[in-house]
């Protein structure tokens, strides 16, 4: 159990059988009446954000999350097979469980898998990955003055906007959080 007075950004709590992460919190002490804590909570499974108010000192169950590092080994049909690097056990996750950053998964890549009561809540991929460009339009000389971009397909199949000077076969660094080009590797 955790008191509402101890809420901090990132604290995980359990409400109605679901895990919620505190995104924002504000302790309010009105001139008349008792103090309360106004929060914005994000559902760890669905990503929905709701506002909820707690009385000051109210206790709620704290969700205990387990974090383990798994290595992506291969894709089997619609499932992605991960191996626990400590126990060498294999586990399967679907693309829906991994989220929209699944397009950056490359064999041998490590990911942090967060579980609660045996359920996978979230899969955290690295913030940046280095991938090879396998398909893009050739850069035309003189096009770089405007600082334009062009689409490029990388080895995992993801589509990324890259500067005009990038060509097929180059290795580029990509930010997986916002699908942006970070630089050459």
Curated annotation (Swiss-Prot):
Record has Acyltransferase as a keyword: no
Pfam families: EFP (PF01132), EFP_N (PF08207), Elong-fact-P_C (PF09285)
GO CC annotation, single: cytoplasm
Protein's pathway: Protein biosynthesis; polypeptide chain elongation
GO biological process: peptide biosynthetic process
Keyword tags: Cytoplasm, Elongation factor, Protein biosynthesis
Compartments where found: Cytoplasm
UniProt xrefs under SUPFAM superfamilies: Nucleic acid-binding proteins, Translation proteins SH3-like domain
InterPro entries in the record: Elong-fact-P_C, NA-bd_OB-fold, Rib_uL2_dom2, Transl_elong_fac_P/YeiP, Transl_elong_KOW-like, Transl_elong_P/YeiP_cen, Transl_elong_P/YeiP_CS, Transl_elongation_fac_P
One MF term in the entry's GO annotations: translation elongation factor activity
Family, per entry: Belongs to the elongation factor P family.
Function description: Involved in peptide bond synthesis. Stimulates efficient translation and peptide-bond synthesis on native or reconstituted 70S ribosomes in vitro. Probably functions indirectly by altering the affinity of the ribosome for aminoacyl-tRNA, thus increasing their reactivity as acceptors for peptidyl transferase.
Protein's name in the database: Elongation factor P
Organism of derivation: Synechococcus elongatus (strain ATCC 33912 / PCC 7942 / FACHB-805) (Anacystis nidulans R2)
Higher taxonomy: Bacteria, Bacillati, Cyanobacteriota, Cyanophyceae, Synechococcales
């Amino acid at each position: 159990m955790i008191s509402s007075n101890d809420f901090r950004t990132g604290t995980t709590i359990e409400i109605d059988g679901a895990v919620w992460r505190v995104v924002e919190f504000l302790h309010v002490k009105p001139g008349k009446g008792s103090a309360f804590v106004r929060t914005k909570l994000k559902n760890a499974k669905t990503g929905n954000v709701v506002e909820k108010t707690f009385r000051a000192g109210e206790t709620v169950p704290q969700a205990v999350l387990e974090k383990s590092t798994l290595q992506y080994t291969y894709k089997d049909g619609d499932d992605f097979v991960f191996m626990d690097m400590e126990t060498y056990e294999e586990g399967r996750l679907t693309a829906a469980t991994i989220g929209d950053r699944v397009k950056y998964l490359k064999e041998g890549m490590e990911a942090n898998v967060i579980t609660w009561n045996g359920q996978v809540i979230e899969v955290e991929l690295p913030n940046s990955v280095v991938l090879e460009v396998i398909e893009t339009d050739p850069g035309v000389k003189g096009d770089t003055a405007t600082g334009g971009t062009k689409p490029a397909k990388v080895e995992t199949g993801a589509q990324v906007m890259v500067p005009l000077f990038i060509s097929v076969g180059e290795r580029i660094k990509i930010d997986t959080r916002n699908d942006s080009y970070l630089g050459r590797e």
